[in-house]
């Protein structure tokens, strides 16, 4: 999938220039016959390329959106910026700086009250006033996976004063574990620029544990078929335990946002979303906002 990235981006650019460069209303989308759907690149099991074909949980959900409008999905694979506000600006309301394209909808956006009310420190304006965030479709959380033979269970993070744990750099687990108990376990926190590299070392026994997103860990270690080999925690102590993920649409086109919200709600109630997750070997956690 990594080798496909440059080719993929070039082909996507060609497609982008053949369609509208603006985020659009439902009528505009139907008239064009295409909907531009933004997903994060190289991010299994959510969105990734496999043998030149887009795959993933968010890809399947995006197909549902496209099918509901009877249009073709155009995939806009995007990297993650320094923060979510930048991601939303570059994909939804301002557009990419290079090719100016705006996506009609973006997946995997935190549906979190604190974020929805977050303001820009310099302007005092809402960070997300240019987008509307609706359609929560799953709940995600940070967890730790261990090799059962080495660490059969975790009662305290202090165990990593003696055992090694891998993290992706600059993630919340990295910051939390590195600073735990004033650096007590810092020497055993192994940093990786790519999470897949941490997974590889974990599976090969080079490190004893990994910390990351539950869905991603379950998929990458094939936990469903290896429950005898690995132990998963329910959370990471003292880290925000759980949050919902949803979709973002330009606030100029709330009709599209409400349409997607209704579509996802129906798919949730029909267990279609749960089935998508299970097809990728991931245990589905329903959105907090739909279970309270």
What is each stretch, according to the model?
Residues 5-13:
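Sec-dependent signal peptide recognition
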Residues 24-112:
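Extracytoplasmic small-molecule ligand-binding "clamshell" domains
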Residues 41, 138-143, 214-261, 283-292:
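Periplasmic-binding protein-like
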Residues 62-68, 148-151, 162-164, 241-280:
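Extended ligand-binding regions for polar small-molecule ligands
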């Amino acid at each position: 999938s990594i080798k496909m990235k440059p080719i993929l981006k070039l082909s996507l650019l060609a497609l982008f220039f053949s369609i509208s460069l603006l985020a659009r209303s439902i009528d505009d989308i139907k008239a064009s016959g295409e909907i531009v759907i933004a997903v994060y690149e190289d991010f299994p099991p959510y969105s990734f390329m496999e043998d030149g074909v887009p795959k993933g949980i968010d890809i399947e959900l995006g197909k549902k959106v496209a099918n509901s409008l009877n249009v073709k999905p155009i995939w806009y694979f995007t990297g993650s910026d320094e923060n979510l506000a930048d991601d939303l600006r570059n994909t939804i309301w301002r557009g990419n700086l290079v090719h100016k394209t705006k996506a009609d909808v973006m997946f995997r956006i935190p549906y979190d009250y604190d974020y929805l009310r977050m303001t820009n420190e310099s302007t005092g304006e809402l960070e997300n006033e240019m987008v509307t965030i609706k359609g929560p479709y799953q709940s995600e959380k940070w967890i730790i996976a261990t090799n059962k033979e080495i660490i059969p269970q975790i009662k305290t993070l202090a165990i990593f004063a003696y055992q090694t744990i891998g993290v992706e750099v600059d993630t919340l687990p990295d910051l939390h574990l590195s600073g735990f108990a004033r650096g007590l376990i810092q020497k055993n926190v192994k940093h990786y620029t790519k999470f897949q590299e941490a997974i590889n070392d974990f599976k090969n026994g080079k490190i004893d544990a990994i910390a990351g997103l539950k869905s991603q860990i379950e998929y990458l270690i094939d936990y469903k078929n290896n429950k005898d080999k690995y132990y998963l925690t329910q959370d990471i102590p003292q880290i925000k335990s759980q949050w919902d993920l949803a979709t973002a649409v330009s606030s100029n086109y709330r009709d599209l946002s409400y349409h997607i919200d209704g579509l996802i709600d129906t798919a949730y109630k029909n267990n279609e979303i749960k089935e998508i997750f299970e097809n990728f070997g991931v245990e589905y956690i329903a959105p907090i906002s739909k279970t309270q």
